[in-house]
Amino acid sequence: MEKPSLPKGTRDFGPAQMLKRQYLLQTIREIFTKYGFLPIETPAMENLSVLTGKYGDEGDQLIYKILNSGDFIQGVEQNHLQEGYKKLIPKISKKALRYDLTVPFARHVVMNRNDITFPFKRYQIQPVWRADRPQKGRYCEFMQCDADVVGTDSLLCEAEIVLMIHEAFAALGITDFVVKINNRKILSGIADAIGKEGSEAELCVAIDKLDKIGKEAVLEELKTKGFTDSQLTRLLPVFDLKGNNAEIFPLLRTILAQSSVGLKGIDELEKVFTLIEKSGLGNASIETDLTLARGLSYYTGAIFEVKILNVQMGSVCGGGRYDNLTGVFGLPNVSGVGISFGIDRIYDVMNELNLFPSQESNSTRLLICAFDENTFMHALPMVTKLRAQGINTELYPDPVKIKKQLSYADDKKIPFALLIGEDEMNQGLYSLKNLISGEQFKVTFDEVVHKLI
């Protein structure tokens, strides 16, 4: 018999891990709710036509396609195989697992536009799937935790995303992080300025890999996309623009002086910083990063990434403004902006930094140990009453040897045990044992409740 295993890039989560994940998700969920976001869910699978063409060619290749039911190769001819996967896939697959939550959200908005109040603020916490190469912090199945606003182009939404990020990380105990922000209009302006107008998509896809493959490899990739040595030479100074906004923006305005779209991007970025400061977050951990590109093709305005410092991990949040994502589904001119929290990466960072609280409050607090069938039956109503008082209580399911029952409590780190023998049952005085200190007391039932609440 073949030994069972998991697909690469996927994981099981045991109780200890799930309690931590629930704490993390609930903390962020409460922040979303505070800012007026409401929850939705969408199916794990979407029609393939909904997903393809929204993430660029590289993203499309990472979508998990679902083979058609039955004889899925029926109708496939030799020429389809020779023409490559783009011709073959539509013949054998009509559905796919969702790649992210943003595109399904756009589809949801279009299908439910008559029932939605705009601006529509939604959050969504569900798994997504990507046929990526697994490595530290990168999985094939992972949880996304998104918040988006659609139906307004107000830059207040971008500012509130930054505020929400800061509040969420403060609640989680993460203090050493930076929010990187750029604007896709600036990147379009840079393409214009170096004489490569209309090539911002290729530029963004390449720049997005800067942290992964380095500057030289990015330049080589751009050469393969038709960028000349002269154009790349003019691009290099932009990579090196560092400092605060008072230093960066004047230089950038000079570089992009002939690009109206680039100048508009600078104006938008400055307005976002002003709104953040006016909201009272003057010491925000936020910086302009002109090499931030976000490879996804649907972004049109502000783009965000969050990195936790002094930890070997990629970005833990990402998002941006998209002006016409719903347009491909027949609802044009609906602007939106959103952020996605990388729950799995944040979880790994919090584990590494030991930021999760003790799990004692979420687990069993008292184990009732009965000696025999009579004391077992006597304990049943006690369990119900203790639970009604809000005390997490278990009754060991079999009246076996007390040593085995206490071993169970020890393995589950249950702090108290209530021992009920024949004498205890008859006297109404029970032995309450503190399994951490070893102390043991004789108590009435009411005293048990009083000690554990």
Curated annotation (Swiss-Prot):
The gene is hisS. The lineage of its organism: Bacteria, Pseudomonadati, Bacteroidota, Cytophagia, Cytophagales. It comes from Cytophaga hutchinsonii (strain ATCC 33406 / DSM 1761 / CIP 103989 / NBRC 15051 / NCIMB 9469 / D465). InterPro entries: aa-tRNA-synth_II (IPR006195), aa-tRNA-synth_II/BPL/LPL (IPR045864), Anticodon-bd (IPR004154), Anticodon-bd_dom_sf (IPR036621), His-tRNA-ligase (IPR015807), HisRS-like_core (IPR041715), HisRS/HisZ (IPR004516), HisRS_anticodon (IPR033656). This is Histidine--tRNA ligase. GO terms for cellular component: cytoplasm. It is found in: Cytoplasm. Its main location: cytoplasm. SUPFAM superfamilies: Class II aaRS ABD-related, Class II aaRS and biotin synthetases. Belongs to the class-II aminoacyl-tRNA synthetase family. NCBIfam families: hisS. One of its GO terms (molecular function) is ATP binding. Transmembrane segments: none annotated.
